[in-house]
Amino acid sequence: MASRSGRLIVWFLYTLLVIAVFFCLLSPLAGTAVSRETSAQTGEKVITEAEAICDVKRETCVPSPGPGVASIVSMTYLGKGLRLRETRAHEAKSDLGEKYRVRYSENNGRTWSAWAPVALGTDTLRQNDTYMEESPFAIAYDPAADRTIEVLFRRIFLGEPSAVLAAFWRGERRFADHCSYRFSKNDGRTWTEPRQLVYEGGSVFNPKNWADPDFFQANQMYGSYDITPLSDGRIAYPAVVSVPYREEEEERKICAKVPWYAGKDRVEGVGCFFGKWNPRENDYDWTFSKPVFVPRKVSTRGLEEPTVTELRGGKLLLEMRGSNVYLDPVLFPGRKWISVSADGGKTWSAVVDFRYDTGEPFYAPATFAKFIRSRRTNKLYWIGNISRSPAEGNGPRYPLYIAEVDEQKVALMKKTLTVIDDLQPGDTKDLQLSNFTLLENRVTLDFEIYLSRFGEKPGNIFSANAYRYLLRLK
């Protein structure tokens, strides 16, 4: 009898162990932080889950509609209340969305309107052999104007879009990007007609001739995904623009195989629009700062996908992605790049790499990042990709981290680095945890991320579900 009891106890303990291991394997890496102890496999310094700055929950938002097609989800508030707009689309080719549809909620997502199609993609926008893609790029409630302002992105292709984009990677540019803005005083129920953002002369968009050269060549820009209201009553909106550039002989040799993505003897720099509401004109008065840029040997594709935030004390922090594609990733490491303004954006410091508060640099792929200040903690956070080893061009696009920003040192607080998501068993090495929308839920004060995990399934990188991540700060 005693022997049988002993066997039962052993069996019971073994069963508990198996169950524990099973749930450990199921537990996502999300919500864990980078270890003060060193991993024998990667050399990465990580800390314990108990020291993570937030708890993370991931859930499937919209499954992939079929092989080779990704679900895309974007969520944003309209106005200062609880009105939400959700946009969904499909993507089967890089950077080309199709089948856009939209719905609205008046009560923070408890109930929703019916879905309505909206013409935004190249599958519906065509004029002879010219194609167009339009996309809501950035939106914010401006308390100084008491209006919701939205920036709309427009890309015009001189030819079939996927062929035009393929030619771009060879250094042939047959598309043009422009941005316009519109605003609403009734939480997005009605909008003004879009008005083009300009920083130089030239014609504005002609709906009867999308490829009008006077418009097509002038005021080209790739805008930010974020509009930032400032404490002085202005709004800030950074944008990528082309600037003249001359290589030195040494750099010419280093970059001999690098295409001129912005055009011969030009690089992509970043300037910042500042808008101040003018009640007499019922419009914004705009200024545009002198662009910052880096040599091609620092970033072969220039500075891209900028975002700006206001630090405590009023300084402005501009963060930008770079790329080391075509270069040795060890000699020319991929970084995140920053510039700081102490005079409200009139002038900007020289561009330097974003670092930890310890002074250490970190590797980063060519992906965008976002800043967000929590109303729960009043702290500023950065969300983006940091690589465990030297990044090569666009990848790897994992892990995805959140970290607190040291606003005095203008650096990431290394001890706060927390994994939101990472490469999981079953994911392919082409996994992308990089293209996302972000908001703070105005009821729960949790952060919400909407992200399509491109590369999560074998066979086709676009066979991707869209996910929602809930981040509850500790």
Please tell me what each predicted stretch does.
Residues I9-V10, V18-V21, V34:
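Short hydrophobic transmembrane-like helices used for membrane targeting/insertion
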Residues Y14-P28:
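Bacterial N-terminal signal peptides
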Residues L25-A40:
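Signal peptide processing junction and immediate N-terminal pro/mature segment
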Residues S39-K474:
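Asp-box/BNR beta-propeller blade signature and adjacent active/binding-site loops
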